[in-house]
Amino acid sequence: MNHNIKKINHLIDTLGYEEAFLYLKQIPLDKINSKILEIFLRVCKNICKHQFAFNLLEQLSAKLNNNLIFLYQKALFLKDYGFVLQSIQILNSLRKKNIHPEERKKIYYLIGEILWKSNRFNLALKFYLFFQKQYPNEYQISRNVLICHSNLGNFDGASSQLTILKKINPFDCGEDYRVVTQLKKFTHLSDPYIDEIKSLLAKDLNSNSKSQLLFALGKIYEDLSDYQQSANYYKEANNLKNIEYANFSIQKKIDQFENLKKVFNQKFLQSSKTSNLCKSFFIVGMPRSGTTLLENILSSCEQISPGGELSTYSKYFNTIYQYRFNNSYKNFSENITQKDLEDIGSFYNDEINRMYKSNYIINKLPHNFLYTGFISRSFKNTKIIHCTRDKNDVLLSIYKNFFAGRLLDFVYNTDNLKNYYQFYLDVMAYWAKVLDDNSIFELNYEKLIESPETELQLLFDYLEIKFDKKYLEFYKNSRGIKTLSINQANKKIYKDSKHKWKLFEPYMSELFS
């Protein structure tokens, strides 16, 4: 059996996933153990053989349904492809079995993660609170409870968890302070949070905690209308975070898109569109351009569910690119066909349909602007909404916030941020030039907040859904959100953020020049 595993890994390293898949298919079912299955599922994932993997798991269930490792692997695979309830059912059965406490803890974390990632924040919160009772001194559990309270806009709940976290580990609470301060409007310089944060900053903290505390102070002093002090803290926070992204290159982004553009020649544009019907509304643009506000409004319609920032399309796009075109943009641009895009659309639809039962789903990952043309060719009836906003307000709103993950690697440096913004404008101008006139609906943030009913009527006409004035009362929705806009999610449309950059201009001239 070890020989099999060595041979499979050798095939992957030398000949690629396709050859490894052909070899794996020849192994009899009764010879597939958990180690081989783990590799098999990874291979299937990398060459888009999802249906084969699902069938394989069902065939193995008869033999391995009491095997805890098999059940865990099955739950992980189902989680990755939108089978939320099935995955949780398996994990729930596993946590009740006689297993090692550390394995049970791992399962608890996974169940909470699945609930949270599928936007079931209330359920995730209830589960994490139950989990917390089992492990009261586990730092990450209390942090996850805090995050769920934050997603639901619950300052008191988040604040109480911060108190717990400070007792467990007082020197690693930077993120927790930042999250909690996002939920509160500060009105007095005597607020105890200010002294607490400044006291922590005087200690020997890691750079991540320190930068998050600085972002928190920037927000607090902005609330207090001390824009000079606020700007100083934001600059210090960004300078600290930018050290992690010293290798960022806008030229790499430009070169990448230049290769993508080569696909959209006249012959390709004249080819017939796919037959895939899409129930997603794609909202694209820069971060902090009004995408969350728009999602809140749209999801007030009973037919539309909020999906949040779904990376599903880019996941399948990149899998096809890596597998079929060997990670080569030249190979990709010269050989991609409409069939490849149809496959991406089919894979996307399968996963989205498993996750959501509504007529329409919102996918508001701003980064999808890079794939706008490909999205439009992957489906027959694509609806793409491009959110635009005053450039300087976008730059400021990005610069004064911390972003999780490494996708937004340009945000902590003023030159990188401005260069990326220009790159985004160039990309969207290109799509507007080559795509049909009605492919993209442009929604301007300033127009939306000034004349919401007029702008939304036009948008709903584009979406082919009847507009109702009650959608303007979106702030009455009780759903939670993951993004930085949580403190605005449950408020009416307001105009305070319009031209806010002018308040910071005297202290951040390098950002707006």
Task: Tell where the protein language model's regions lie, with residue ranges.
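TPR alpha-solenoid repeat register
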Residues: 36, 70, 104-107, 141, ...
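Conserved phosphate-donor/acceptor-positioning beta-strand/loop module used by diverse small-molecule
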Residues: 375-400
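Phosphate-binding active sites in nucleotide-utilizing proteins
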Residues: 273-379, 387
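Structural register within alpha-helical repeat arrays
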Residues: 7, 39-40, 74, 111, ...
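PAPS-dependent sulfotransferases, especially Golgi type II membrane carbohydrate sulfotransferases
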Residues: 159-161, 177, 194-206, 214-280, ...
